[in-house]
């Protein structure tokens, strides 16, 4: 098993390394045809922003105020605030820098409770459009991970909360590493593979182990009027807490996009062995969601998550139900503004000590440009 994983890692690493090393010379070898227009190498830079804001009522559980009264917690929050700086040095070299402004929650920190500035993305990108399919590239630095970024492009309600696999702690949206992306010809799908520190963007590397991730997506009927939005995705992540202490995630996903509805189903299998002496935990779960849409901006959101966190404790389950109504304001281009009124109910079964139901009602707002 270890020999097989080592072979996979060597092949994946070789692919990424060759892509990165070959980018510059391959681009230099391409000579535009006599009648073609040379690519635009004018340096460009643009600045954008993303804001997630909400007003949330925590109906359950109640909280106790300073006088010992049991009260319903209500709060205005800024869940996320990004400043996106993107640009091109030439038509083949691009970059992105995205600081993330979020609330510090570390106990004992001098800024506990304050909004703090940290780095979410900072990477260089080599575009291979000159000699590969359009949309092929390699990245180096702190960047989006293959699965979360892909799924957030289909499930548009990140401003309500993270996708199932990230919310349950199995994946992160960003990590430091190198990756390669390739679009299949004729819009049949794409492949995104990379090697990462594995500690996510919120922590430094702590040992010699790396996380190897690969996502492959197939669009079986790209020419069909009604089924071109159907995609089947497989994802695998093999990392280690330490040598021989596996941290593995496998996901099978089916998604569908249409003018009037987006929908998806994910099945997750995750294994963790925290250290040599610890038993391996085996988690299994799934999520299903649908977002019916109208042509006048109104959308619905319905989502159900289920996770069995450890096969050795079969009575333990976590479930979450999300339902809401959203209005997406009409804009030109890639600008997005939306308001979402939603209900979020999480239950916990079989845990010791027992955990209370967490029920939230909220108004979420999104601004992205």
What is each stretch, according to the model?
Residues 64-69, 159-164, 235-238, 272-274, ...:
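Extracytoplasmic loops and strand-loop junctions of Gram-negative outer membrane beta-barrel proteins
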Residues 214-216, 323-329, 355-369:
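Outer-membrane beta-barrel "beta-signal"
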Residues 1-66, 111, 369:
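N-terminal periplasmic/intermembrane-space "pro-region" immediately following the signal or transit peptide
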Residues 184-186, 256-260, 295, 332, ...:
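A generic beta-sheet turn/junction motif
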Residues 295-344:
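C-terminal hydrophobic structural anchor segments
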């Amino acid at each position: 098993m270890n020999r097989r994983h080592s072979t996979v890692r060597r092949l994946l690493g070789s692919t990424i390394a060759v892509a990165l090393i070959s980018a510059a010379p391959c681009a230099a070898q391409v000579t535009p045809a006599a009648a073609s227009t040379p690519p635009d190498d004018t340096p460009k830079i643009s600045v954008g922003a993303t804001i997630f804001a909400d007003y949330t009522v925590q109906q359950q559980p109640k909280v106790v105020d300073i006088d010992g009264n049991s009260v319903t917690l209500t709060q205005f929050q800024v869940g996320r605030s990004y400043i996106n700086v993107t640009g091109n040095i030439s038509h083949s070299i691009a970059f992105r820098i995205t600081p993330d402004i979020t609330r510090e929650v570390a106990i004992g920190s001098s800024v506990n409770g304050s909004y703090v500035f940290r780095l979410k993305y900072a990477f260089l990108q080599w575009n291979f459009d000159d000699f590969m399919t359009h949309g092929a590239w390699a990245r180096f630095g702190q960047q989006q991970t293959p699965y979360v970024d892909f799924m957030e492009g289909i499930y548009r309600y990140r401003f309500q909360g993270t996708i199932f696999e990230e919310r349950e702690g199995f994946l992160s949206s960003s990590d430091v590493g190198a990756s390669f992306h390739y679009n299949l010809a004729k819009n049949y799908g794409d492949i995104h593979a990379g090697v990462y520190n594995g500690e996510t963007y919120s922590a430094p590397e702590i040992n010699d182990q790396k996380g190897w991730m690969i996502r492959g997506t197939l669009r079986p009927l790209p020419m069909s009027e009604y089924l071109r939005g159907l995609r089947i995705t497989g994802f695998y992540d093999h990392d280690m807490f330490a040598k021989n202490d596996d941290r593995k995630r496998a996901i099978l996903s089916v998604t569908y996009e249409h003018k009037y509805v987006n929908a998806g189903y994910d099945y997750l299998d995750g294994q963790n062995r925290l250290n040599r002496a610890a038993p391996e935990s085996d988690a299994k779960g799934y999520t299903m969601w649908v977002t019916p849409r109208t042509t006048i901006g109104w959308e619905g959101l319905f989502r159900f998550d289920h996770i069995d966190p450890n096969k050795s404790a079969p009575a333990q389950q976590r479930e979450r139900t999300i339902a809401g109504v959203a209005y997406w304001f009409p804009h030109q281009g890639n600008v997005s503004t939306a308001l979402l009124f939603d209900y979020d109910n999480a239950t916990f079964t079989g845990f010791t000590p027992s955990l209370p139901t967490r029920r939230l009602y909220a108004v979420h707002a999104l601004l992205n440009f």
